[in-house]
């Protein structure tokens, strides 16, 4: 209509008789409704200049630690707050969480924390954030239940405000209006978020797939996603985990058929199944099959016991009366009458399955009468840990089904065709692939470009990026503080690169400690030096090496006396360098050397 109005004056000027011949058109052109819309168009232009800032604090270039902050008109909201498990180089580290410096600096602006679903890579860091400051948590019923369980361990559940949300129920948070949208995933009650702001609407999918035959909760809400696409979506932030996989993700129904076949194969054996404790759908399938097969069910692993109890309480899991037994009761039934559902599908060192493989589980002893199913694929980086457990179980005589041997696992993430459907339905102006390593983000970006989204409108951001969006442009602003904070026991952030380097050094070459007593005035050795070795060599089999090392230390201390070196740090440095050089010449190894000089 606007184009018609712009063209009419020129047409009238070229044809003076036009007005008399088309008076109706002239009256239509000057109708008040047209001009009444002009202020609204001007207002829309003003709104279009309002930017929204997106700050990814985790989840880009990595799988895990998902956390994103949105800012518009001075208001902020956070979506997800997850953790990532440490890699093999992070010696002694329990988990890695995002750096909260940026959100703590802006805590007065933050209106709430929105959670897409209850997996650890999306909720695992919440207790550590709430130790910094309080803020309300918005999540679906199951998600809030899982978070509440986690916060109880930290003594934070009682003072945290939970707001239970449901799909299509809009939430007003400052200048943001957020609508949860139901999506399929490997855990119930998963949602995407449509985040409406003065700058426009952004859709963040969370973890999703499109399962046309789901076990429960219905298909991903494609209708609502399409409606937002028709209204206009400023940007889409979409799950990239399976961006390299063509086709569609298999339905969860496929797992039921595969596990049913394995139940038949293990007719006369005890069945042990390891899966994610949060995969409520999978656990329910196993329970249903156990009931069909006339077997009792037991749970092992703290998270498995806690999650299933909570899921039953909230009505997400149904276990027929008389089916559930405790793990202590397993031996009271014949092997062919029980199923044990356990944690440890990712090879976690302290998990129930890991303890079974190392014969350290107090209630369960694995042997030739066991049929073990690992119903999960290893997360990248966990392959060695899983293989170690599989080998341990096989050595004990058990039959083990793992990885792709049978259809015992399907992904909870969208493959390429589902990602294309999400892009097609939402029709975003800008696209930001999220939730994946760089190669996955890159592949997802190429998929979006193949559907016609201009490459100038596609941005592969990094953790700490300041992505500024408006209806007119997408650009990067000044980055914000970001990083990986390591949690080791009760210590949060007190393990840095220097500590990790020392731990790595100790793990590779061991430690040599030098103890000597010296005169504080003259520097002469009064006792020692004595050498203590840990993780370096077995002293009794290397006496000549240790005797030579002792002589090197004595000579270094004597030279310090002769040269009147009295600064104890300098003395320690000389001793360390002399001994390090000697040990490397003899062994080609470089243990950590720790001189301890006691002054008398």
Could you describe each region identified by the protein language model?
Residues 1-48:
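Intrinsically disordered, low-complexity RNA-associated tracts
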Residues 564-600:
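C-terminal tails and terminal domains of large nucleic-acid-associated
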Residues 151, 448, 583:
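Conserved hydrophobic residues forming the short capping helix/wall of the S-adenosyl-L-methionine
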Residues 60, 84-98, 109-110, 402-405, ...:
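A glycine- and charged-residue-rich anion-binding loop/surface
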Residues 136, 432, 594:
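Short glycine-rich phosphate-binding loop at a beta-alpha junction
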Residues 245-375, 379-428, 432-548, 552-564, ...:
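Hard-cation-handling environments
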Residues 166, 462, 589-593:
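Short Gly/Ser/Thr- and Asp/Glu-enriched loop/turn motifs at secondary-structure junctions
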Residues 32-114, 119-333, 351-365, 384-388:
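His/Asp/Glu-rich metal-coordinating catalytic cores
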């Amino acid at each position: 209509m606007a184009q018609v109005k712009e063209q009419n004056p020129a047409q009238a000027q070229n044809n003076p008789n036009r007005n008399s011949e088309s008076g109706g058109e002239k009256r239509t052109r000057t109708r008040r409704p047209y001009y009444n819309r002009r202020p609204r168009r001007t207002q829309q232009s003003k709104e279009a200049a309002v930017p929204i800032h997106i700050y990814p604090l985790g989840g880009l270039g990595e799988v895990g630690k998902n956390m994103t902050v949105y800012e518009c008109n001075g208001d902020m909201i956070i979506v997800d707050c997850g953790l990532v498990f440490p890699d093999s180089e992070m010696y002694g580290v329990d988990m890695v969480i995002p750096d909260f410096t940026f959100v703590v600096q802006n805590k007065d602006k933050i209106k709430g924390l929105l959670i897409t679903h209850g997996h650890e890579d999306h909720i695992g860091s919440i207790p550590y954030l709430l130790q910094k400051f309080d803020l309300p948590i918005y999540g679906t019923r199951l998600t809030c239940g899982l978070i509440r369980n986690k916060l109880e361990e930290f003594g934070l559940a009682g003072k945290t405000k939970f707001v239970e949300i449901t799909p299509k129920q809009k939430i007003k948070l400052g200048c943001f209006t957020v609508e949860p949208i139901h999506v399929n995933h490997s855990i119930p009650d998963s949602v995407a978020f449509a985040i409406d702001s003065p700058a426009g609407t952004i859709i963040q999918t969370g973890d999703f797939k499109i399962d046309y035959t789901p076990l429960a909760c219905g298909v991903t809400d494609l209708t609502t996603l399409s409606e937002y696409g028709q209204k206009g979506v400023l940007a889409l932030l979409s799950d990239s985990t399976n961006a390299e996989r063509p086709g569609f993700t298999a339905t969860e129904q496929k797992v039921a058929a595969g596990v049913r076949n394995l139940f038949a194969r293990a007719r006369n054996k005890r069945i042990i199944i390891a899966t994610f404790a949060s995969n409520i759908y999978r656990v329910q399938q196993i329970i249903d099959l156990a009931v069909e097969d006339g077997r009792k069910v037991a749970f092992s692993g703290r998270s498995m016991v806690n999650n299933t109890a909570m899921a039953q309480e909230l009505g997400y899991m149904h276990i027929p009366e008389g089916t559930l037994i405790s793990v202590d009761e397993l031996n009271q039934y014949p092997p062919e009458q029980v199923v044990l559902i356990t944690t440890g599908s990712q090879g976690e060192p302290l998990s129930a399955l890991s303890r079974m493989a190392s014969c350290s589980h107090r209630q369960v002893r694995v042997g030739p009468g066991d049929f073990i199913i690992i119903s999960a694929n290893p997360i990248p980086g966990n392959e060695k840990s899983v293989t170690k457990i599989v080998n341990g179980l096989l050595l004990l005589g058990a039959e083990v089904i793992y990885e792709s041997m049978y259809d015992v696992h399907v992904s909870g993430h969208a493959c390429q065709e589902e990602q294309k459907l999400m892009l097609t339905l939402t029709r975003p102006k800008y696209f930001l692939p999220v939730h994946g390593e760089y190669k996955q983000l890159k592949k997802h970006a190429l998929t979006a470009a193949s559907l016609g989204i201009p490459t100038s409108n596609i941005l592969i951001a990094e953790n700490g990026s300041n992505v500024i969006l408006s209806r007119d442009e997408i650009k990067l602003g000044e980055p914000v503080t970001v990083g990986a904070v390591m949690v080791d026991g009760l210590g949060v952030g007190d393990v840095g690169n220097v500590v990790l380097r020392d731990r790595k050094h100790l793990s590779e070459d061991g430690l040599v400690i030098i103890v000597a007593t010296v005169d504080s005035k003259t520097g002469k050795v009064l006792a020692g030096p004595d050498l203590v070795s840990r993780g370096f060599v077995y002293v009794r089999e290397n006496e000549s090496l240790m005797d030579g090392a002792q002589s090197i230390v004595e000579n270094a201390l004597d030279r310090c006396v002769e040269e009147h070196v009295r600064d104890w740090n300098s003395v320690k440095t000389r001793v360390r360098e002399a001994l390090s050089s000697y040990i490397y010449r003899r062994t080609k190894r470089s243990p950590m050397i720790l001189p301890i000089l006691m002054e008398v």
